[in-house]
Amino acid sequence: GCRFTWYFHYMPVGNDAAADLLPTPEQRIKMYDSVRRFRATKSLFTMDFQNDAEYVGGCIAGGRRYLHINANGDVDPCVFIHFSNANIKECTLLEALKSPIFMEYHKGQPFNKNMLRPCQMLENPELLRKMVERAGAKSTDLQSPETAEHLCAKCDHYAEVWKKQADELWSESQAKKAAKKSTTC
């Protein structure tokens, strides 16, 4: 039987990706609550890629715990972030990890103190724009190269509407943890 589930949110990657498929704040809160309910009532481990960043200290990409190498050999910081300065056919993995885009990740992580807003693309698109520009990273999308501006523009509204809900939910979550900790100590 199933012992592990991992939920991923829609990521609007690609020139033709539709931003209106991103979950609404209400849908995201429902996922947050559902995953926590599953953990409390089901005998399986359930993880939510976006809503569980607190368990891994934020975004895992950029070589912190994860990276992506596409079919062309381009070393991307994330499977959803198709921007790079390095190709594994031309450098070592260590050299790729020291490339400008990976160093931008290293300098910026975590991208937000609110672990319900961990992603520099989805919840903090203003950061990804700057990171790609400072790094001079190029699109590595093999089908239809997309600019950082185009990618991030699809996330701006989502980030804006999610921020208020995420900040409230994060504050509540941290208050509950603090209250629980004070009663167990």
What are these regions (language model features)?
Residues 1-58, 71-72, 76, 80-88:
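Radical SAM enzyme [4Fe-4S]-AdoMet core and its adjacent flexible, acidic
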Residues 58-59, 111:
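Short secondary-structure boundary/capping segments
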Residues 60-64:
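Short, small/polar residue-rich loop motifs at catalytic or cofactor-binding pockets
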Residues 80-185:
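Flexible mid-to-C-terminal extensions adjoining Fe-S/redox cofactors in radical SAM and related proteins
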